[in-house]
């Protein structure tokens, strides 16, 4: 019985050790386009058509954090092809951007780069911890 308990505790600790990375899912019009736990701009670039953007629907971002980041503040950052920030919004674990809003952003640029910024909810810790934006996905408009 003790051996089973020790093996169980070892497995639990190994599982929790392996779950250090945050992960995210990006969904466009109820279709999952990215699910990942690491930033890779080339791999997470998706082409979207004007017809997809004209449909009624949403771009949904679901961000899953490990326990250490559970109560941290998250921001979604949207940049254009020239690395100019065009939109930002704070969110808890998920957020939705309507296709009509994406369409208005795509009138100004043909490429949207979406990042997440995770920072401590305690403002006194923000200067201690290096904040880095994580690339979630890139949307390129195909005309």
Regions found by a protein language model. Name each.
Residues 1-21:
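Bacterial Sec-dependent N-terminal signal peptides
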Residues 19-143:
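Terminal leader/tail segments of proteins
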């Amino acid at each position: 019985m003790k051996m089973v308990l020790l093996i169980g505790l070892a497995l639990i600790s190994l599982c929790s050790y392996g779950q250090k990375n945050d992960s995210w899912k990006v969904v466009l019009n109820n279709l999952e386009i990215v699910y990942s736990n690491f930033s890779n701009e080339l791999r997470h670039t998706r082409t979207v058509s004007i017809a997809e953007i004209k449909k009624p629907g949403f771009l949904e971002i679901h961000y899953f954090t490990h326990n250490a980041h559970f109560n941290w503040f998250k921001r979604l950052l949207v940049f254009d092809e020239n690395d100019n920030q065009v939109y930002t919004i704070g969110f808890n674990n998920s957020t939705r951007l309507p296709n009509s809003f994406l369409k208005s952003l795509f009138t100004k640029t043909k490429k949207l780069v979406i990042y997440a910024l995770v920072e401590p909810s305690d403002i006194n810790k923000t200067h201690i911890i290096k904040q880095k934006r994580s690339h979630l996905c890139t949307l390129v408009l195909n005309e």
